[in-house]
Swiss-Prot record:
The keyword Iron-sulfur does not apply. GO terms for cellular component: cytosolic large ribosomal subunit. Keywords: Ribonucleoprotein, Ribosomal protein, RNA-binding, rRNA-binding. Binds to the 23S rRNA. GO terms for molecular function: rRNA binding; structural constituent of ribosome. It comes from Pelodictyon phaeoclathratiforme (strain DSM 5477 / BU-1). This is Large ribosomal subunit protein uL15. Part of the 50S ribosomal subunit. One of its GO terms (biological process) is translation. Residues 1-45 are annotated as: Disordered. The lineage of its organism: Bacteria, Pseudomonadati, Chlorobiota, Chlorobiia, Chlorobiales.
Length: 184
């Protein structure tokens, strides 16, 4: 026996059923849909009419909504960060770009550091948010916390600042100004 003689088990591979290809094929004429009527036509869907009974979509209440400003957030625990340090993936600093590559995230994602676990070495971590316990544990290990205000996508659009500075600069808040009247 060699690799060139390997074949799939008998009955494991079936030919695709091609319907509507003549009567001799066994699936011609009506293409497996039976005889005439609404159900044999294209575009037919089984109705959800329940015959006088209040339909399911009206019996069940409406609930919940998705906020328009919801942001995709990737969370990282201190145990994971400590493992990265021990594996040699990061040294004494973790930036947003490091988090993106280590977590396989997109440019639009936010990163939050959670305090599950312990840190064994001092490290500087840049992220968008930190839990209280994470901040305390990082400080206890001799590390520092740097908060970023923009995603990678937003920082790349800032023209007058270098990329690293744009990440850390807060976004400008819109100020509504009263219109000046043109009347004398």
């Amino acid at each position: 026996m060699d690799l060139s003689s390997l074949r799939p088990a008998k009955g494991a591979v079936k030919n695709k059923k091609r319907v509507g290809r003549g009567q001799g094929s066994g699936n011609g004429t009506t293409a497996g849909k039976g005889n005439n009527g609404q159900q044999s036509r294209s575009g037919y869907k089984r109705p959800i009419i329940e015959g006088g009974q209040v339909p399911v979509y009206r019996r069940l209440p409406k609930f919940g909504f998705t906020p328009l400003d919801k942001k995709p957030v990737n969370t990282v625990n201190l145990t994971q960060i400590d493992k990265w340090i021990q594996d040699g993936l990061v040294e004494n600093e973790i930036t947003i770009l490091d988090l993106k590559s280590l977590l396989h995230a997109s440019n639009a994602d936010y990163f939050k550091i959670l305090g599950n676990g312990e840190l064994t070495s001092a490290i500087t971590i840049t992220a968008h948010a930190f839990s209280k316990s994470a901040e305390e544990k990082i400080a206890a290990a001799g590390g520092t916390v740097v908060k970023a205000f923009r995603t990678l996508e937003e920082a790349s659009k800032v023209r007058d600042l270098p990329f690293e500075e744009a990440l850390l600069k807060p976004k400008a808040k819109l100020v509504k100004r009263a219109k000046k009247s043109t009347k004398p």
